Design a protein with these regions (language model features):
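Periplasmic solute-binding protein
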Residues: 88-99, 118-146, 174-184, 263-269
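Short beta-strand->loop
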Residues: 100-109, 123-124, 152-155, 233, ...
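Mature extracytoplasmic/periplasmic domains
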Residues: 266, 271-327
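C-terminal motif of bacterial Sec signal peptides marking the signal peptidase cleavage site
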Residues: 17-20
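Early extracytoplasmic/lumenal segment of secretory-pathway proteins
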Residues: 22-93, 222, 349
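Pocket-flanking alpha-helical
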Residues: 42, 64-100, 108-119, 217, ...
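A structural signal for short loop-to-beta-strand junctions that line the ligand-binding cleft
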Residues: 78-83, 101-138, 152, 162-168
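Ligand-binding pocket segment of bilobal, Venus flytrap-like solute-binding proteins
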Residues: 173-255, 259-260
Length: 349
């Protein structure tokens, strides 16, 4: 009887040990769902893996909006542990759906308050960029025209058939630009954002589904016939970076109109039901460290939120708007679909 008791006790101890280790074994793989533009050096990911005895799996799920939709569909039983790339245009929907667990990173003291996405720390800011108009310098020089200094000018004859934008229903920069026009013109004034878009339609604005098609096909710098495109304030710097010859200035420029640029902040959140929560928390801390923060600017052409992180030298060809659109994530979350529906009726139908 004593032998049986000792044997049973041994079995219980073994089972208890296995159970206690089970979470650790599960914690060895971290799955990060993100957008297709996500790009971090393999050696940086490897550093995290080696430091944590773990494997990182990057799960790309389309653009930021598509990744969010997938995370919502998987709510409570996610295929990933983290969602990277949720920005302030989609933040409201993500918080309403309650797909994230809260986590306050110890590294947040390195992040200025203006990049805070939500006070409950369900989404942690990682990077930021500015969405605005870019212009083709050579085209404007040849045409003898100056870059616009107000959005109202875009509805004039000088800019007829010269602007390409992205569809805000399916494009992140397209949505950011739409939101900027809402902030700039308002919704209830004598001339509001929808009046502006009606005038743009009458002025033959071109609408494309994605940034790549608009920038690399229709933008005149890349062979198209439109010298104005919705892009990013870092795009002129990217033109210098990718040039086959050394440049002393960018062939493109930024149109930085007060109140008409959009500060886009990307963040990361731990998905509810994640298998590897402790590892996910460590990755968020790692993503805010300078090693990670200094790796992505020359790959994703966005700025680090860590105030101690440095940007590449070619970022001097980028510009930082002094007065981006003043509109809160809460208002965006509340009215985003309304704005998109109204825009679609005015511009596409």
């Amino acid at each position: 009887m004593a032998i049986s008791f000792r044997a049973a006790a041994a079995v219980i101890l073994v089972l208890a040990f296995v159970a206690s280790c089970g979470g650790e074994y599960e914690d060895r793989e971290l799955v990060i769902m993100t957008h297709d533009s996500f790009d971090i050096s393999e050696e940086v990911i490897k550093e995290f893996e080696e430091a944590n005895d773990a494997t990182v799996v990057i799960q790309k799920a389309g653009d930021a909006g598509q990744a969010l939709v997938r995370a919502i569909l998987e709510k409570g039983n996610p295929s990933a542990d983290l969602l990277y790339g949720i920005d302030n245009t989609y933040l409201g929907r993500a918080l309403d759906e309650e797909i994230f667990d809260s986590y306050e990173s110890k590294m947040l003291d390195k992040v200025p308050d203006r990049f805070t996405l939500d006070d409950t720390n369900h989404v942690t800011p990682i990077d930021f960029a500015y969405v605005n108009l870019n212009f083709d310098k050579a085209f404007l020089d040849d045409a003898g025209i100056q870059a616009p200094t107000t959005l109202e000018e875009l509805a004039g004859p000088e800019w007829k058939s010269r602007l390409v934008v992205q569809n805000p229903a399916v494009s992140s920069p397209g949505l950011a630009f739409l939101i900027a026009t809402v902030a700039y013109f308002g919704e209830d004034d004598d001339y509001d954002y929808l009046d502006f878009w009606k005038d743009l339609r009458a002025n033959d604005v071109q609408v494309k589904d994605g940034w790549s098609e608009a920038y690399y096909t229709d933008f005149s710098k890349n062979g198209g016939d439109r010298p104005l495109v919705v892009s990013y304030a870092t795009s002129p710097a990217a033109e210098v970076f990718f040039s086959e010859v050394e440049l002393t200035e960018s062939p493109t420029g930024n149109v930085l109109i007060d109140g008409a640029t959009f500060l886009q902040i990307e963040g990361i959140g731990i998905l509810k039901g994640a298998n590897s929560k402790s590892l996910a928390k460590r990755f968020i801390d790692f993503a805010l460290d300078t090693r990670f923060q200094e790796d992505f600017p020359d790959k994703m052409f966005v700025y680090p939120v860590n105030r101690d992180a440095k940007t590449p030298d070619f970022f001097r060809f980028a510009q930082v708007p002094t007065q981006p659109a003043d509109i809160s994530p809460a208002e965006i979350g509340e009215k985003r679909e309304e704005w998109i529906d109204a825009w679609t009726k005015v511009v596409l139908r």
